[in-house]
Every structure is written in structure tokens, then in C-alpha cells.
UniProtKB/Swiss-Prot annotation:
Poor inhibitor of platelet aggregation. The disintegrin inhibits the adhesion of the alpha-4/beta-1 (ITGA4/ITGB1) integrin to VCAM-1. Inhibition on alpha-IIb/beta-3 (ITGA2B/ITGB3) is low. Pfam families: Disintegrin. It comes from Echis ocellatus. The keyword Disulfide bond applies. This is Disintegrin EO5A. Disulfide bonds join C53-C76, C67-C73, C72-C97, C85-C104. GO terms for molecular function: toxin activity. It is found in: Secreted. PANTHER family: ADAM A DISINTEGRIN AND METALLOPROTEASE DOMAIN, ADAM METALLOPROTEASE. A motif (Cell attachment site) lies at residues 89-91. SMART domains: DISIN.
Amino acid sequence: MIPVLLVTICLAVFPFQGSSIILESGNINDYEIVYPKKVAVLPTGAMNSAHPCCDPVTCQPKQGEHCISGPCCRNCKFLNSGTICKKTMLDGLNDYCTGVTSDCPRNPYKGKEDD
């Protein structure tokens, strides 16, 4: 009887005890799913199962779709290779989509001080 009572009290007083993690993205507004030895960042709004690109069970792109979000993702598909994803004002060394990822890779010809 005593152990059951203690468990009941603990659950009533501390119902949501758990370990804390620091988000890999550093942004407290991002959602992240944590798997053993892997952290997958979810885009804002991905927790909403109505997201058109996201499988609500796995939070991965639906079958036949390439991506959920990102600068090189539109309508659940990767943008074509060579599409400008970050335009620069001064030097003309824009960043371009690769056609195989939703990320916007940095132009390899830019110097360290350029951005």
C-alpha cells in the first residue's frame, strides 16, 4: 500500500519529469526529434499533421516527395540545380541550389569574409 501511495504522490507532484536536451540548432523555437545518436531538426509547423509535405507519423517527407522545407524546397520538391537560393548584393557570388538537397550550400568561390 505504501509503495503505491508514494508512486501516486510522485506522479501527481512531478508528472512530467524527464531529461533536458540542448537543441542542436540552438533555436528554442525549433522542434527536434531525438533518436539514439541522431537529432533530426523539424521545420516550424511540422508538428501540425496538416503540413502538405510531412508524413504525420514519421515527420519525414511523404512518399514521392523530396523535402519538407528549406531554401531549396518548393511544393515538396527540390529546386532545380542552379536556382539562386541566396543572392549577394556586392560581389555577384550568389549561392545556388544543387537540385539534390533542400539546403542552400555556400558558394565555394566566396572568401571567408564574404556573406
